[in-house]
C-alpha cells in the first residue's frame, strides 16, 4: 500500500477520474487526532501490502479541495471505490475498525459467524386472574 502525501487538488481529482480505489485522509499538522491516526495508517500500510493506496491531504495546503469535499471535522476519511465515495467518516478510527472498513471497501469482508440457534418453545401454564 502506498501512502501518497499532499497531492494537489488536480492530482486528487485525476485519481477519481481514473476510477481508483483508495482511502483519502484529510488532516492538519496541528490536529492531535490526526497525528494519532497517522501512526495507525502507517501500521495498516505495512500490513495490507499493495492492495490499496492511502492519500493524505493537508487541509491547510488544499483549502479549496477541503471545502469542495465538505470537510468540517478532521481527520476526515473518505473511502473511495472506483472513483466514487463509498463512505466517509469524521474523527479518529481505531486500527481494527479502520482495517475492517478497508477490507469491506476491497470486497474482502470476513465471513459472518452464524449465531447458534437459541430459539425455544414457550408454554404458558395457568391463566392468572
Identify the residue ranges that each predicted region occupies.
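N-terminal leader/targeting and pre-domain segments
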Residues: 1-20, 97
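Aromatic-flanked redox-active Cys/Sec active sites in thiol-based oxidoreductases
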Residues: 26-30, 129
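The canonical Cys-X-X-Cys-His
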Residues: 31-34, 77
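Typically the conserved alpha-helix immediately C-terminal to a functionally engaged Cys/Sec
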Residues: 35-49
Amino acid at each position: 500500500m502506498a501512502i501518497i502525501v499532499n497531492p494537489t487538488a488536480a492530482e486528487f481529482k485525476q485519481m477519481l477520474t481514473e476510477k481508483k480505489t483508495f482511502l483519502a485522509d484529510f488532516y492538519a499538522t496541528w490536529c492531535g487526532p490526526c497525528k494519532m491516526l497517522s501512526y495507525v495508517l502507517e501500521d495498516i500500510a505495512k500490513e495490507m501490502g499493495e492492495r490499496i493506496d492511502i492519500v493524505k491531504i493537508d487541509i491547510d495546503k488544499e483549502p479549496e479541495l477541503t471545502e469542495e469535499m465538505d470537510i468540517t471535522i478532521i481527520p476526515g476519511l473518505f473511502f473511495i471505490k472506483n472513483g466514487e465515495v463509498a463512505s466517509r467518516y469524521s474523527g479518529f478510527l481505531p486500527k481494527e475498525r479502520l482495517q475492517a472498513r478497508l477490507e469491506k471497501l476491497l470486497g474482502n469482508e470476513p465471513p459472518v459467524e452464524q449465531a447458534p440457534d437459541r430459539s425455544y418453545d414457550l408454554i404458558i401454564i395457568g391463566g392468572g386472574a
